[in-house]
Amino acid sequence: MDPHQSPADNAASPTKSVKATTKNSSTNNNVNSNNSNNNSNHDILNFNDNYTTILQHLANDHPNILREKGGSQQQQHQQQQQQQQQQQQQQQQQSLDTLLHHYQSLLSKSDNAIAFDDNVSNSADHNGSNSNNNNNNNDISSPGNLMGSCNQCRLKKTKCNYFPDLGNCLECETSRTKCTFSIAPNYLKRTSSGANNNMPTSSNSKRMKNFEDYSNRLPSSMLYRHQQQQQQQQQQQRIQYPRSSFFVGPASVFDLNLTKHVRLDNVDQIQLSKTLSLRKVSPTAQFILQDDFDTTLHSKQEYEVDLVENLVHPHGHLLVEIFFKLIHPFLPILHERVFLEKYSRSYRELTAPLLASIYSLALQYWDFHPALLGFPKPDVTAQLNNIALETFYARVGRPKLSIIQTGLLILQCRSECHNNWVLCSSVVALAEELGLGVECNDWKLPKWEKDLRKRLAWAVWLMDKWCALNEGRQSHLILGRNWMIKLLNFDDFPLNSPTILNSLQNDQSGSSPSSSNDVKNHQIAFGNLPIFNINPTLEDFKNGTLMFQQMVSLSIILGEIMDTFYTQGSMTINKSIEQVLKLAKPLQLKLREWYHSLPKNLSMSYATPQKLNSNSTLTLAYFATEITLHRKIICALNPQTPKELVQVCRTAARTRLVAAIEFIRDLKNEHINAFWYNCSTGNLMLIGTFAALLYVTSATKEEAMIFRDYVRNYTWVLKIGSKYFDKLSNALNNMHLLFAQIPGLLTDEPVVVSPNSNINSVNPQRSGVQSQIPIQFNVGSPAMTEQGSPLNQWKNLPQEILQQLNSFPNGTTSTTTPVNPTSRQTQLESQGSPAINSANNNSNNTPLPFAPNKSSKKTSQSSPNVTPSHMSRHPPSNTSSPRVNSSTNVNSNTQMNASPLTSINETRQESGDAADEKTAGRERTANEESSTELKDDNPNSNQETSATGNQTIKMNDDKNVTINTRETPL
């Protein structure tokens, strides 16, 4: 079919009826041809078709309309006309509708009608008139010819070239808009200013008079039906139905080499069928566009979005404001200006799942908006989530960017659910359908759409990686294979947020309902109730977009860790500890580089009282990534692993665990009530899982009890915080399901060391948990023989000697180990740990307390260090703990700047627990002796320390393993 041919040309029913009628009355037409000169309506009848026969059939239904004086002649033909009426009743009805349609379009065709009126000869050939009529029928079939130029072309004053098969003119198709027709332009021209146009011609007046007379004689039902059809057509023209897009891959049947030989239109598009078109956006990328939206789906969509709006009415606009202030800066996946423009016109221009997910996320901050303090929070979050999920799956078959935005927001709403993998996979599949994994810089798209596609692509990547980690699945996206997007930069984000900018302007004028003055007034009215300032600045908006960039960068490192160690193939290959350490080393360096490159405004120390701070969600993600890497290292240890290597690996793992637990303990209200990514609950569970893993892999009972205390204190932190933080509550409940099944972990059952964990593990220092064994110690001490750790020898000492050792003051014991100056300098230069920095933030809020260990008295004989100092219920102190030996005591600056990437050499003092102080002497003495034994002063030792700080360990099979103790145990 010719692409420029109207679909109405193929609709044969109206045309056939007219032709059939023409054959039956051809004799009458020839007879009346001589009288056509005297017919005042001759120009009208010849304009579109031979309407004389149609009028005759119309007269059959209404004989009074065209009644003449020759009544006897009418009676002769009455029986014949009645028979024709019964046979062609349906065809006549269609002809009447066509006649009405043609008469209505006469006004827009007046210019052509005038030409016909002036040039048509009285002796015109009948065949020639029929050919003109057929051409006019083709022109009338398209809306562009019915109404003239479309609104867009009329405003631009350009020629409107309408293509019926495309449904658009050339200008509208280029600008990707829908042709709309409101008022006939030719009629506007006639009524516009001008002397000639203001004076009606005789032919125009005749046409108008005949049209009015004829329309007055028509039945009222026909006019009503025609008016109703006209209103429906105008309503459909106003609605711009979006088309679904499908990216055409290189292996598709629509091969690029074939489409190169296809003739495209001016917008690089070809119409494949009535509902399908192929569009090339670049020499190497093309899409299939499908018209799969109709009035039925539109009506259903309006019903669904009305249902969503009624659940939160009349507070929908405030929830949208909350979303773009507190959530969207950290998840910038919407085009804010376009969204607000549509929402300001009507919420019906948005889809139900998108609006429901936005309302659901904003309801979390209902109590923080001053304008909503006097209203009860609607209990509709579950309803909104269900509507969003159901309507989302109903639209999966029609891929659009808005569907991906909806899926990402639903994943954020379902952050506490543990079965999001199917939903996440659907979002990834939709991203592949739209080609988000392909670089679009050279595509023929506007810049705002390119930027939006890049942000959406990396948001899908982020969701896929963290969901795969938390649910133990294989990630679908592989960087460099099916994901070829460049990293985000500052130019890919909007310069500002219209919502935040408008709020700041209202604050300056004092007209905002949530201005700072109102916040102060509410704070005075409610006493000491903490009222947070939810009005972010433009700097906060930039920090939010910067956090999104850093989260994407961290997820790339996480993706490498998952692909290296947690795929089915890698788990069967990378089993030996040597191979694992070799592969883990570059990943550890990338993590360190990422942490050191964090700007100050994303650190835990960057906080303002009574202002929400979301930096904690980024720090938690960093700890989860570190733990994910060290989980593999711990699982790779086996009984054949050298003792020194086991000691280094487990010490590094213990360091990460302690830092993560302290980080959660020191969270403040500004962090808890701020935005958290959907992976945060799973990351909280990873910390507890890692502690339990170290517990079950402990080689000795004493070490197992230490990690058991870590697990118990961490669960106590979650229990205290769960009263006002749902993520802590959900993490605690999910952890308890498994931990309760492990003997001795949460109960006072005897600790049983698993026979499979027959690892020559180092016995952890019996001082406070903060006094870690530094990574800079000299490993491979000859005292660590097959007979076990020298700490076991202290059990045979008399009780009197132990009491005398307890009386020694801290730091006076002679058995000290000097710290390597090079290693100490490296420590001083290292960046502070996020956990340590979080403990020293300047804030008025009290950190979460730790619970006292209820089983400390029962197990004090077998494990002196039951309640570590860092787990104390009291606030941490900056003074050195008496439990820490002098070999691990570094100055206070070193303690405050120790990075979790090297070691945590923190020392804190308990300030109110006399029972724990009684056991401090025994622990201190054991630690001092352990430090002395770990020190290697024997030049004949089987280890070598290079000038750069690298230590080479000679293994049993004469293989050397080099460990860089200046940087990391890896």
Curated annotation (Swiss-Prot):
Phosphoserine: modified positions: S833
Highest taxon of the lineage? Eukaryota
GO MF annotation: an example: DNA binding
Keyword terms, alphabetized: Activator, DNA-binding, Metal-binding, Nucleus, Phosphoprotein, Transcription, Transcription regulation, Zinc
Task: Supply the Gene3D superfamilies for this chain.
Answer: Zn(2)-C6 fungal-type DNA-binding domain
Biased composition range(s): Polar residues: 824-836, 858-870, 895-906, 939-954, 961-970
Where does it localize? Nucleus
Compositionally biased residues, Basic and acidic residues:
907-938
Q: Tell me what else is known.
A: Present with 704 molecules/cell in log phase SD medium.
Task: Identify this protein by name.
Answer: Transcriptional activator protein DAL81
